[in-house]
Amino acid sequence: MREHLFATVDLSQQAGHPLSCTYHILIKDITEPIQCESYGVRVTVNQTGERKELPDITVLPDAVLKLVQQLAEGGVTPCTLRSVVEDWLI
């Protein structure tokens, strides 16, 4: 699996203490039954190392790019990532 760093966002003002999150796009090559790429996301809290990743969300690169942009803009943390992505998928 490959990864692409999308953004690092400072959330200190919202949290009231030093806090920043890094947002990555995860890329997995799929060869069967057709050759394509599957995309997911990972969010990491830089101060603690807490992280959550959700692979295989979509095969559409534009969709995962839009998703990770919304995650970064919204300051989504690892503990809320699954819920936010589930709502995004609906």
Show which residues each predicted segment covers:
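Negatively charged, low-complexity tracts enriched in Asp/Glu with abundant Ser/Thr
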Residues: 1-23
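A short, structured beta-strand/loop element
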Residues: 31-53
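Compositionally biased, low-complexity repeat tracts
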Residues: 12, 36, 70-71
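A generic structural signal for solvent-exposed, polar alpha-helical segments
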Residues: 10-12, 29, 45
